[in-house]
Each structure stands twice: as structure tokens, then as C-alpha cells.
């Protein structure tokens, strides 16, 4: 998968318009971060990419195929998704949750294999949850559940990861660990993020949304500016640059002239 083309995408709930004519060509083989204040439409846009929301108006095309025409099993083999909420009705262990990521490769009633369990062990190790394999998923903390759900994505062996606020509930150690991990997979990532400095560190391309529209798209150096912070977030801040030329947002406004 190389490209996702979104054209004139609208979405409404009742009389409220959530997405207002989204148009963008997004690389599906790089790390793309969606930015913007709460309620701007980031999660809703992502849910169109992984087909939770049907398309009401406009189009979403992955490479040359409209997403509605991609068979669900094929889509699940290509795209791994980690949403914001992880409610589980039954008492599954962490290992069982991760094993579900192999479902797109299974026929009905096909048993899990030794190779499947090996993938699960490796994935849990990569997210720092190997010792929790037999623990109840529902008894894990929010951050631990996040890491287990990412492990489930990893065993899908997808070409694209869609992550909705993947650093929620994580302490800074695991925020950095998870983003470093997904960055190093060598596959496409589209992630909604709130931390602008983390987005600048890990994303190749930033997509900034405001009030259901895409306001601007560019590299971290192009996007993270004093003017953008004021326009999108309504805050005064200073922007400096590290040794690699990446922007760093400093919210201590008393330093501003």
C-alpha cells in the first residue's frame, strides 16, 4: 500500500457536520501524525479509514481501490488498528487478546498454531508485556491495555498501522518506547497525537485539523510554528529547534517578548 486518497469527505451526525470536505493524499508508507484540538475530527477521519463509519459523501481510495470494495479479510491483513477504547465483554487473557490478531489469516474453527503463539510471545515482548500474558485483560491498567492492543496489531503483520492517540494512559517511558517501536517497523503509520513534540520527533508528515477541515499539511519544520499554535490551539508559545533541526514547543509564555 502506497497512498490513501481522500476527496471531499463529509460526515454528519444528525444536523452536526463533523467532517467538512476533507481532501488529502496521504502516503501509506510513512509516519503521518494527525494533529488538532479535541473535537476537530481526527478520530472520525481515522474511523473512515478503517471503516467504522460508512462514507456518506466523498471518497476514500487506498492505492487504486475504493475502501468499500476491499474485502474485509484482505483489509484486516493490510491494516492494523488501535483505537482509543478497549472494552472487552469477556474475560480474555492478554495472550488471547493478542492471538485475535491472527484471525484474518484463519478459516472458521482453524486452531492457533505454534507459529501463532511464537508471534504472540514476540509481540508481547516488544511492547514490554511478556510477563502479563496470562493476566486478565480487564484487570490491566489503561496503559497496559494500550500495549497489549498494539501487540495484537503487530501479530497481524500489517502494512499500515492506524493508531488513535496511542500514547494515552502511558507514562513517558512507554510513550517513547511505543513510538520508537512503530517508527522502526518500516511500515506506514497514521496516528492521531496530542503531544506536538512527540509528533515532531517521530512523524514524517503532519496533518493539522481544525473544525472538521484540514488546515495544513507539511513536515514538522513547516507546520510547528508560533503562528500555527496560535491559530489552531489558541495559545502563545515559543518554538525552538534541536540539534537535528526538529521543532520544540516551549509553552512558558513568559519567555516571549
Region locations from a protein language model:
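Helix-to-loop junction immediately C-terminal to a conserved catalytic motif
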Residues: 50
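ABC ATPase nucleotide-binding domains
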Residues: 231-257
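A short, proline-enriched helix->beta-strand linker immediately N-terminal to the Walker B motif
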Residues: 155-159
Amino acid at each position: 500500500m502506497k497512498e490513501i486518497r481522500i476527496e471531499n469527505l463529509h460526515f454528519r451526525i444528525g444536523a452536526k457536520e463533523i467532517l467538512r470536505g476533507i481532501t488529502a493524499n496521504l502516503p501509506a508508507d510513512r509516519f503521518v501524525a494527525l494533529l488538532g484540538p479535541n473535537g476537530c475530527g481526527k478520530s472520525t477521519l481515522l474511523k473512515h479509514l478503517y471503516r467504522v463509519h460508512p462514507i456518506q459523501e466523498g471518497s476514500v481510495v487506498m492505492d487504486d481501490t475504493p475502501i468499500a470494495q476491499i474485502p474485509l479479510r484482505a483489509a484486516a491483513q493490510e491494516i492494523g488498528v488501535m483505537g482509543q477504547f478497549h472494552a472487552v465483554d469477556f474475560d480474555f487473557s492478554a495472550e488471547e487478546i493478542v492471538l485475535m490478531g491472527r484471525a484474518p489469516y484463519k478459516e472458521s474453527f482453524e486452531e492457533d498454531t505454534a507459529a501463532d503463539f511464537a508471534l504472540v510471545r514476540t509481540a508481547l515482548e516488544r511492547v514490554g508485556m511478556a510477563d502479563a500474558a496470562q493476566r486478565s485483560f480487564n484487570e490491566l491498567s489503561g496503559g497496559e491495555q494500550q500495549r497489549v492492543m498494539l501487540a495484537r496489531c503487530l501479530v497481524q503483520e500489517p502494512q499500515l498501522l492506524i493508531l488513535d492517540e496511542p500514547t494515552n494512559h502511558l507514562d513517558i517511558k512507554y510513550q517513547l518506547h511505543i513510538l520508537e517501536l512503530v517508527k522502526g517497523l518500516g511500515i506506514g503509520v497514521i496516528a492521531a497525537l496530542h503531544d506536538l513534540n512527540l509528533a515532531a520527533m517521530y512523524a514524517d508528515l503532519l496533518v493539522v485539523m481544525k473544525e472538521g477541515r484540514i488546515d495544513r499539511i507539511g513536515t514538522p519544520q513547516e507546520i510547528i510554528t508560533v503562528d500555527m499554535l496560535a491559530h489552531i490551539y489558541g495559545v502563545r508559545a515559543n518554538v525552538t529547534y534541536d540539534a537535528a533541526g526538529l521543532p520544540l514547543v516551549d509553552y512558558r509564555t513568559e519567555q516571549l517578548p
